[in-house]
Amino acid sequence: MNRFDNESRRTAEARNGNGGELGAAARELSKIAVEENKRTTGLSQRAAYRKRLFEMRRGLNGEYRRNYALAAGSVFCGAVGEVLVNEYYRVEKQLRIAAAEAESLKFGRLPCFAAGEAAGSLRCAVLAKKLCELCGGAPGIGSVVEFFDEYQQNKPLTTREIQLLPAMLRRAELETLYGIVCTAGDGPLGTGRAAALQNVLAAL
């Protein structure tokens, strides 16, 4: 049996866990490879988030303005929301970083919350609500939260809600919300919401 065959046999034994020290070394290398793969995957994901944020900063004007809030909501949720529910307070630092990013994007408090709801995820909604608080909150934010709870249950807007909306929100925020509703299409917000918000905008 030549040297190549011997090496092949040892490699096969190591892979099967039958090679003594060589097998142990191979298993250790395998663990290192797995950890390295996890690490590099995480790095590539973070690089993707940074790239997306950069693209959003470039697209704050024109046609992109209607869609960037929804896109930003999903980016923040992807970066932080996965651990938010189980480790709410432990991610305070990441949330503050995300809030700073939101402010640097001139990302309004209400659109941030609406983006989470439009994404159709409870984690998104919780994250965006926390971002609202970290950005300084807003008058009547409790009413806004209740309002979006109604959204999640897909209930039609009442006349009273339509009357309260202008008092809770600035026109610019309503317009952004209307854009998010349109972007969401047949999602949790539903197409009926767009018509209701259009009526509110027309009444202002």
Enumerate the language-model features and the residues they cover.
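Active-site activation/catalytic loop segments of kinase-like enzymes and analogous catalytic loops
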Residues: G120-R160, L169-P188
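Structured alpha-helical bundle/scaffold domains in large eukaryotic membrane-trafficking regulators
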Residues: F107-L110, G185, L189
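Hydrophobic/aromatic interaction determinants used to assemble and anchor large protein complexes
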Residues: L189, A195-L204
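ATP-dependent phospho-/nucleotidyl transfer catalytic cores
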Residues: N2-R3, R9-G116, A195-N199
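Mid-to-C-terminal catalytic subdomains of enzymes
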Residues: Q163
